[in-house]
Amino acid sequence: MKKTLMAAVALMLLMMTAVALTGCGSDDDDNNTPKPDDTTPVAAVMDYSLTVGDDMLSLLNLTIEYYDADGKVQTEPLTQKSWKKSVRAKLPATLGVRLKMQLKDGADPASLAQFTAAYGYSYNGYAVSATDKVVGNVVNSGTDQTLAMQGDKVTTWLEHHTDGLVKFLYNFAANGQATSSNWQ
């Protein structure tokens, strides 16, 4: 009888151990965790491109202001014919760029027979999901301009563009929708 009782207890312990081990399952909880919707916007991206001509580089101090990923305005001198940057910021976000200009020290535009203001820009802004899928509206534009003027007209032209020759600014809401805004 003792042997039978011991065998029954051992069998019960074995069965309880088996039930406990199979009841735990795997440590992989990812199967039950809901995955984020791939259409939920999480960030805004803005790709910028600016170009300028030789006359502008030689006569003017050119400064680029843009919003960085932290929402702060950064400033960079433009010392080459082209400039490109891509900024990614967590939503909601403000993204934009502006090209400011002033005469270089000692520059005398009136002494020039002709000044050519050649410049171009493009931008492409959009919201992305966690998997970098484009969601929301896309904002983009671009143009190339060439304006020839007599040297004595350069100062007046600069005065008309004190707040920036090229400027655009967009506010991206938490839902990924972008609306245009103004530089202050």
Place the predicted regions along the sequence by residue.
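C-terminal partner/receptor-binding element of secreted or periplasmic proteins
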Residues: 138-184
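Bacterial N-terminal signal peptides that target proteins for export
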Residues: 1-10
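Hydrophobic beta-strand segments within beta-rich accessory/binding domains
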Residues: 46-52, 92-111
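Tryptophan-paired
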Residues: 67-104
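Hydrophobic helical h-region of N-terminal Sec-dependent signal peptides
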Residues: 9-18
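Bacterial Sec-dependent N-terminal signal peptides
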Residues: 4, 17-46
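Exposed low-complexity, polar/acidic, P/S/T/G-rich flexible segments that act as propeptides
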Residues: 109-130
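Short, surface-exposed binding/anchoring microloops in extracellular/periplasmic proteins
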Residues: 34-67
